[in-house]
Amino acid sequence: MRIVIQRVGHASVTIEGEVKSAIKQGYLILLGVEESDTSEDVDWLVRKVIGLRVFDDENHVMNRSIMDVNSEILVISQFTLFASYKKGNRPSWLRAAKHEISVPLYEEFCKKLSDALGKPVGTGEFGADMKVELLNDGPVTIMMDTHNKE
């Protein structure tokens, strides 16, 4: 699994002209699922996201987690995170998991994240054409990959 976490002042996702989810301060997370991903990958990412300390403390040091600041999370499915561009200029998404693998893992990630956060997590709609709007805060943008745990 691969995610891009962006610390945001606010974010929303619109589908067919209607806002599906919106958050205030927190994280916008783009989530890509690979064929070999499992529930263990979900658990690792949830622990990392919840524990990540990228919100400022009283000394303006990034020392607080999403739990510490009681913020919100919006999760958007993003198969293009697994783009391969080795050959030519048109990306290939062969590494991205098919729906029967990616949808259950996306839903599991959102549910476990919501359970850990103690409140609902905003979501997009898997496979839909979405318009995502955000105000990047910082900017703080972090990538995580369960197959490259750095």
Which role fits each region the language model picked out?
Residues M1-N89, A97, P104-E150:
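N-terminal, polar/charged subdomain of small-to-medium soluble alpha/beta proteins
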